[in-house]
Amino acid sequence: MERGALVGSSSTSSYYVPYHFRQSKSNFSSFKPKNKLNPTQFRFNCSWFKPVSSITAAKCNMFDYAVTAAGDVEAEHPVDDKQFVRWFREAWPYLWAHRGCTFVVIISGEIIAGSSCDAILKDIAFLHHLGIRFVLVPGTQEQIDQLLAERGREATYVGRYRVTDAASLQAAKEAAGAISVMLEAKLSPGPSICNIRRHGDRSRLHDIGVRVDTGNFFAAKRRGVVDGVDFGATGEVKKIDVDRICERLDGGSVVLLRNLGHSSSGEVLNCNTYEVATACALAIGADKLICIMDGPILDESGHLIHFLTLQEADMLVRKRAQQSDIAANYVKAVGDGSMAYPEPPNNTNGNITSAQNGRAVSFWGNGNHTPIFQNGVGFDNGNGLWPCEQGFAIGGEERLSRLNGYLSELAAAAFVCRGGVKRVHLLDGTISGVLLLELFKRDGMGTMVASDVYEGTRDARVEDLAGIRHIIKPLEESGILVRRTDEELLRALDSFVVVEREGQIIACAALFPFFKDKCGEVAAIAVASDCRGQGQGDKLLDYIEKKASSLGLEKLFLLTTRTADWFVRRGFQECSIEIIPESRRQRINLSRNSKYYMKKLIPDRSGISVMRI
């Protein structure tokens, strides 16, 4: 999983305290370095921790969360350096995984108008310099409404769209311009000179921090008259200029995509921010769409929803279609489900292919035709093209009133996931450091909607025996796997999980639990030869680990002769045979001279349950 490094995960003392707090705005408000922290809030026992009269940022203060007594960092708190080093080592896989990825980020108008915007932009600048490519799409709805109110005018909405008269268009131009200038200014400063003076390149001390490029990166057209309503200068996305956006990203710039579009006749049109952002994410084949909002996605009990599969998000939106215009428009846009809706978890899940040249991506489909999103055209479902659905617009009175919570943002997330963007993150921007916590903390800090997590993974069935045998036979013949007869394989079938793609078994693995010892054996991880190098083995191992955790197991072990390196890279450590449960030791074929490896499982709080897949 890529949700992020688990910083400060042990029960020992730690200064990186955000990970020891409940995920609520009230707790995170205390992470301002100016505030004194109450040691009784910590969730660990620190025999050496004592309240101090003054608290300042430590020299290892990566995210402004570390605190220590002034002047006593090295003498009394040597654990700080250890935690700092540990954080970097644990974050390394995620730093590596995100580098070179393209994230489209929507920053809502409410967040831009609030006090948390500066910190979010600092984090974006930090991530940009780590090699993440950003397209920023700022919201302007609140700012436009405020400008109209100051001029004695009232905003008019019909459905998801604003009716843009001359006054509204002028306000939209002013709001977009002011926000663009502000974002460019906030992203321009480099890192603090005092922090880089020792090791930094002195010739770069006064360089501009982040280069921001903006311009006419998409073509628009008038929405026109719909159901008798003249929307004036309201625009819809016609086509994203993928080549120019990618050129700027390749050149090391952050692309700022405003909601002002330009028509073929030279008009300026006021477009919907979410429509622009979702259309851009689909067209350029973004790795993520990140929506920074002014609140969290909560369940009926008021708890944060950490994770939703595409099926679950789609189902939640569809259930509200009778009471929500935005949900109804989602159903209208993507269809009733017969064309591209995933089958139930026990059946075959379709295949999601990656974007090609940033212009076309496919999503889950049934039958012989895989629906395709094509920039500037729409979705081709095999029965003709869907016009005008370049992106998904949300807004209007429904979004402003929040009668349906953040259902509109969830609908947009499901829309782009169905179009091929594999991950969408819905984040509460009022939480300090939420972007870093979401990307570098294993369980995240927001709600992730994903189309690719455990795609096609399920428990094995009797009809899968032939497919499993086909995959493991070459590995048995080479001595990598222990030979199993058909009878042995059938008896162990309940312990197998498989990955199915287009009706074919492409990977398998087994988990044999030993409940008395609270551990389980991982066995028979195998991937079809033509599907290797696609991460299927990692997906299966992650699935096995989550399944083991759900069964109450605390450790996993395995026996291997030739694949030790693969498992060591995934957290397994060599152990003695005495660590293996007695009942399993009695059945070990010592003539194979296998090596034994063990891995302790970290309690999983990501919200991703294999029982839901």
UniProtKB/Swiss-Prot annotation:
<feature type="transit peptide" description="Chloroplast">
    <location>
        <begin position="1"/>
        <end position="74"/>
    </location>
</feature>
<comment type="pathway">
    <text>Amino-acid biosynthesis; L-arginine biosynthesis; N(2)-acetyl-L-ornithine from L-glutamate: step 1/4.</text>
</comment>
<comment type="similarity">
    <text>Belongs to the acetyltransferase family. ArgA subfamily.</text>
</comment>
<dbReference type="GO" id="GO:0004042">
    <property type="term" value="F:L-glutamate N-acetyltransferase activity"/>
</dbReference>
<dbReference type="InterPro" id="IPR033719">
    <property type="entry name" value="NAGS_kin"/>
</dbReference>
<dbReference type="InterPro" id="IPR036393">
    <property type="entry name" value="AceGlu_kinase-like_sf"/>
</dbReference>
<dbReference type="InterPro" id="IPR001048">
    <property type="entry name" value="Asp/Glu/Uridylate_kinase"/>
</dbReference>
<dbReference type="GO" id="GO:0009507">
    <property type="term" value="C:chloroplast"/>
</dbReference>
<dbReference type="InterPro" id="IPR010167">
    <property type="entry name" value="NH2A_AcTrfase"/>
</dbReference>
<keyword id="KW-0028">Amino-acid biosynthesis</keyword>
<protein>
    <recommendedName>
        <fullName>Probable amino-acid acetyltransferase NAGS2, chloroplastic</fullName>
        <ecNumber>2.3.1.1</ecNumber>
    </recommendedName>
</protein>
<keyword id="KW-0150">Chloroplast</keyword>
<dbReference type="Pfam" id="PF00696">
    <property type="entry name" value="AA_kinase"/>
</dbReference>
<keyword id="KW-0012">Acyltransferase</keyword>
<keyword id="KW-0809">Transit peptide</keyword>
<dbReference type="InterPro" id="IPR000182">
    <property type="entry name" value="GNAT_dom"/>
</dbReference>
<feature type="domain" description="N-acetyltransferase">
    <location>
        <begin position="455"/>
        <end position="603"/>
    </location>
</feature>
<keyword id="KW-0055">Arginine biosynthesis</keyword>
<keyword id="KW-0808">Transferase</keyword>
<comment type="function">
    <text>N-acetylglutamate synthase involved in arginine biosynthesis.</text>
</comment>
<dbReference type="GO" id="GO:0006526">
    <property type="term" value="P:L-arginine biosynthetic process"/>
</dbReference>
<dbReference type="InterPro" id="IPR016181">
    <property type="entry name" value="Acyl_CoA_acyltransferase"/>
</dbReference>
<keyword id="KW-0934">Plastid</keyword>
<dbReference type="Pfam" id="PF00583">
    <property type="entry name" value="Acetyltransf_1"/>
</dbReference>
